[in-house]
Amino acid sequence: QMGLAENQLTSDLVEDWILNNPEASICTPEGINDFRAIANFQDYHGLAEFRNAVAKFMARTRGNRITFDPDRIVMSGGATGAHEVTAFCLADPGEAFLVPIPYYPGFDRDLRWRTGVKLVPVMCDSSNNFVLTKEALEDAYEKAREDNIRVKGLLITNPSNPLGTIMDRKTLRTVVSFINEKRIHLVCDEIYAATVFSQPGFISIAEILEDETDIECDRNLVHIVYSLSKDMGFPGFRVGIIYSYNDAVVNCARKMSSFGLVSTQTQYLLASMLNDDEFVERFLAESAKRLAQRFRVFTGGLAKVGIKCLQSNAGLFVWMDLRQLLKKPTFDSETELWKVIIHEVKINVSPGYSFHCTEPGWFRVCFA
């Protein structure tokens, strides 16, 4: 199974922590005394200690170069729920978000299915290693206007899924300047923030807001979606985070989050874990070390048989280039090759067309 972006490399560290901290769970003899308090109705905005712990963890995964206000954190059922709530808050049916391609296929579900919002692709290709440019943003924006589609925002994923790359400071400055010029919102999916395993390091959009004082930036237009699914390896816990600099969005998202709450038991356990500074420090360091080692082994093995990947340093996957194996440079040929990999090689990988890539022959392969 190399088609799911799961981080299973550090499960043992979490298991050891739970064994050594049984009082963190209300389902153990050591924690049972708190059962009634936790099992009853709680603040729908989330436990204060959990929001504080998440704010501290978000700062830690960004090198403690910035801080986050716990009162601006809104809980949701995973990043899926967080994205949908954000879309409901920012756009009406028929309005659109620009999204650089290739992008995570789940965005088509998260942002479109129930909201009626459209996604307009921003063209990025291998000629410059899929780097987002001002020209591509302008082209997508103008194309939407020509089609009578009102653009309400830009959605970026940093680090990128499926590319495994990070956006540098120059690109992030371009993004901020663009959304301010167009007066549209910016939604930054940063759920892979702590999966960077080599230099250059991750730069959060929050850092741009703090540091780049020479460019115009209306904070009311900026929103971050985060999760513990990838950085901590907890996709089953369904912990999604919306962090908005816009008071109206925070208030609206809080009301909507009532339909997708994070269980209090989960909050209680994770608050204790994330407040263990020694564990978090050790966990993040070991996670980066293991991701780097797995990345080197996997890409090294591919290189030995002549298969290249896009140069990357983050995420739980590589963007594998199999264009030379296509019978023809078409998506039909890509599908044919994908079926061979699935049915004959017996490996589940994801074809590039599922990420809306415009170039046949690219595949996402998860290695963690």
Swiss-Prot record:
Pathway participation: Alkene biosynthesis; ethylene biosynthesis via S-adenosyl-L-methionine; ethylene from S-adenosyl-L-methionine: step 1/2
What InterPro entries has UniProt attached to this entry?
Aminotransferase_I/II_large, Ethylene_sulfur-biosynth, NHTrfase_class1_PyrdxlP-BS, PyrdxlP-dep_Trfase, PyrdxlP-dep_Trfase_major, PyrdxlP-dep_Trfase_small
Entry's EC annotation: 4.4.1.14
Q: Name one process (GO BP) from the record.
A: ethylene biosynthetic process
| Disulfide bridges in this chain | none
Superkingdom of source: Eukaryota
- Induction pattern: Hormones, such as auxin, environmental factors, such as mechanical wounding and a number of chemicals.
UniProtKB keywords:
Ethylene biosynthesis, Fruit ripening, Lyase, Pyridoxal phosphate, S-adenosyl-L-methionine
Q: Modified residue N6-(pyridoxal phosphate)lysine is at which positions?
A: K230
The protein's required cofactors? pyridoxal 5'-phosphate
Keyword rRNA processing on this protein? Answer: no
Q: What does this protein do?
A: Catalyzes the formation of 1-aminocyclopropane-1-carboxylate, a direct precursor of ethylene in higher plants.
Assembly information from the UniProt record:
Homodimer.
Q: What is this protein called?
A: 1-aminocyclopropane-1-carboxylate synthase
Q: Which organism is it from?
A: Vigna radiata var. radiata (Mung bean)
